[in-house]
């Protein structure tokens, strides 16, 4: 009988169900007469404590690239690739490096050859490069161009005048260094401020291939032998900037050996106030090291970044490196400022060209493939050219803690 009752329960009249299930009375949260229970309101949470003041840390991701050495096959292919307003299109040369540059706030390069919009292009031994090359580098992300090297005087006074006009026509966010409009210009230190960090740029060269400055030149280089002038400039830059970056065109061509003159000048530059020293000219890789300046600062020196792009013909000349560092400025709560060069890494690059020095372009080693090595035009003379050979050259010349292959 009980089972029947349960199954029939849903059919009972509505009033029967309502009377059978008592309704709960709401609990009052109001105070009642003495002896009644009182429910208190929740207390408001205490405000979170103010965070402790922290030092201000400002950083710049900085890269430096070696010799942009434009031989005839490079500008001739650029002419064939051109369309639209430009007479030459060099973008193909740099398109594989542009994503890497985009990861940095500042990209510096040694512009080994004169760039102009006026002179006819020419190759070794006296170079002249279409201005469209520099514009392509600008599009790729380069903003700082070092102009002091052994080819600066290749076209004499007319070349200096033309290149000054060219660099005066490019966007204002470009910084050039290494050409000075006479002694009265030596006190004008190129400066750049990025992310609240001010960087000074100076560049010097060991020689100009025996071509002297003449009185009709509108600008001149400063030679590494002019140590009094260099000392004054570096010390002046030290007072103006958080970081002093010095490019030096020095050393022995096609030699991986750092000579005593390079080491001595690097130490002097560090003692005078340089924070980062970038070496170019040998066309091949040389090692890098930390130097301790007279005031205790740690100064990073890359003695040679090798070639960035060229159509030279030996494997060593086709393997360069891009330096990547972090420039960090820390302002303490008491106003004290500390500046440090951090995490230097040298990333190998490979200049690739096909048979007949065609289709010249540059890759980071980490993006280069064995298939590309097998199609490289250099294999005609060096059939063993391979990823293993490239790694071997890089490892033989760069300390392992500084080398980044992947």
What is the predicted function of each stretch?
Residues 1-3:
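N-terminal Sec-pathway targeting helices
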Residues 5, 9-26, 35, 39-406:
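Acidic, metal/ion-coordinating pockets
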């Amino acid at each position: 009988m009980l089972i029947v009752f349960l199954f029939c329960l849903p059919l009972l009249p509505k009033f029967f169900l309502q009377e059978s299930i008592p309704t709960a009375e709401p609990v009052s949260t109001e105070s009642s007469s003495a002896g009644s229970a009182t429910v208190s309101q929740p207390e408001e949470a205490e405000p979170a404590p103010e965070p402790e003041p922290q030092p201000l840390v400002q950083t710049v991701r900085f890269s430096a690239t070696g010799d942009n050495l434009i031989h005839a096959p490079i500008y001739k292919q650029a002419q064939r690739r051109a369309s639209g307003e430009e007479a030459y299109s060099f973008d193909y040369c740099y398109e594989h490096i542009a994503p890497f540059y985009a990861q940095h706030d500042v990209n510096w390069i040694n512009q080994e050859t004169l760039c102009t919009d006026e002179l006819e292009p020419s190759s070794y031994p006296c170079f002249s490069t279409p201005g469209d090359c520099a514009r392509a580098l600008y599009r790729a992300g380069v903003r700082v161009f070092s102009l002091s090297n052994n080819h600066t005087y290749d076209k004499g006074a007319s070349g200096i005048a033309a290149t000054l006009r060219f660099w005066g026509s490019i966007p204002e966010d470009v910084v050039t260094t290494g050409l000075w409009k006479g002694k009265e210009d030596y006190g004008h230190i190129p400066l750049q401020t990025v992310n609240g960090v001010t960087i000074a740029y100076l560049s010097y060269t060991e020689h100009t291939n025996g071509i002297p400055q003449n009185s009709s030149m509108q600008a001149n280089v400063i030679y590494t032998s002019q140590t009094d002038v260099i000392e004054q400039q570096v010390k002046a830059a030290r007072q103006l900037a958080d970081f002093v970056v010095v490019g030096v065109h020095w050393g022995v061509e096609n030699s991986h050996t750092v000579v005593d003159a390079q080491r001595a000048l690097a130490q002097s530059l560090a003692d005078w106030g340089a924070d980062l020293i970038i070496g170019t000219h040998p066309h091949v890789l040389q090692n890098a090291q930390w130097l301790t300046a007279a005031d205790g600062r740690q100064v990073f020196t890359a003695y040679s970044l090798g070639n960035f792009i060229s159509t030279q013909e030996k494997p060593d000349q086709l393997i360069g490196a891009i330096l990547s560092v972090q420039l960090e400025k820390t302002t303490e709560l008491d106003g004290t400022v500390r500046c440090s060069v951090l995490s230097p890494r040298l990333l190998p690059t490979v200049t690739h060209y096909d048979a007949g020095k065609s289709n010249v372009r540059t890759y980071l080693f980490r993006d280069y493939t064995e298939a590309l090595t097998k199609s490289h035009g250099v294999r005609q003379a060096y059939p063993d050219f391979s990823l293993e050979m490239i790694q071997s050259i890089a490892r033989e010349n760069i300390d392992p803690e500084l080398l980044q292959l992947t």
